[in-house]
């Protein structure tokens, strides 16, 4: 039975989420502030964390950053569930390490669909990494077991989502991949208008791979259509991390 940790100081929301998750067959644990939530994440090793942002003691952005820096919790998927719905809030959430972001008030069925998609996508291991083969094209090699890109001979460590997104683009290199297809293949759910999710992670990839992320040569935006990975023998510029 998958275990889900809810970190939220609003008992009405926590109880609503817990009841629906338990009815769907999940084991649910709760924490009411950021410090307790981080400690429980280490102790319980849940399959998914649902994280509010406006928490006592330590805010959700900071909690997520700490979870990502701790090797014991770095791979646990995080779904931010919060009343902060501005674009900048979403960008900050993804920048802090969230896998998905859902704004309150939310539809319960959509929440459950996001949970299923995250658990299905990760299963604590990204879908692309379930395949053992190394994928190579031109100057780019993806090593699934280490979530690593070899880019013009340089080793670049990727997050799980960055790896899956780059894997998706590499499989269709030279072709435009629509945001809808990316959301289906990488995040595992039917697309809505959640394009900002993709933009943030594309920006992260460009920071690691492009010599000038503001003027990308390899991961290109095809306006109105999607994104295209164009590989050439001209050297890229991301610094190994």
UniProtKB/Swiss-Prot annotation:
GO function term, MF aspect, one: transcription cis-regulatory region binding
Where is it localised?
Cytoplasm
The record ties this protein, via Gene3D superfamilies, to:
3.40.50.2300, 6.10.250.690, Winged helix-like DNA-binding domain superfamily/Winged helix DNA-binding domain
Superkingdom, according to UniProt? Answer: Bacteria
Which residues are modified to 4-aspartylphosphate? 52
The cross-references to Pfam families, in alphabetical order and at most eight, read:
Response_reg, Trans_reg_C
Task performed by this protein: Response regulator of 2 two-component regulatory systems SasA/RpaA and CikA/RpaA involved in genome-wide circadian gene expression. The histidine kinases have opposing effects modulated by the clock oscillator proteins; SasA phosphorylates RpaA (stimulated by fully phosphorylated KaiC1) while CikA dephosphorylates phospho-RpaA (stimulated by the phospho-Ser-432-KaiC1-KaiB complex). The RpaA regulon is about 300 genes, and includes itself, cikA, sigE, sigG, genes involved in photosynthesis, carbon metabolism in the light and dark, phototaxis, CRISPR arrays 2 and 3 as well as nearly 90 ncRNAs. Genes are up- or down-regulated in its absence. Involved in regulation of primary sugar and amino acid metabolism and in adaptation to light changes. Regulates the accumulation of the monomeric photosystem I and the D1 protein under high light conditions.
* Protein name, as recorded: DNA-binding dual master transcriptional regulator RpaA
**Species this protein is from:** Synechocystis sp. (strain ATCC 27184 / PCC 6803 / Kazusa)
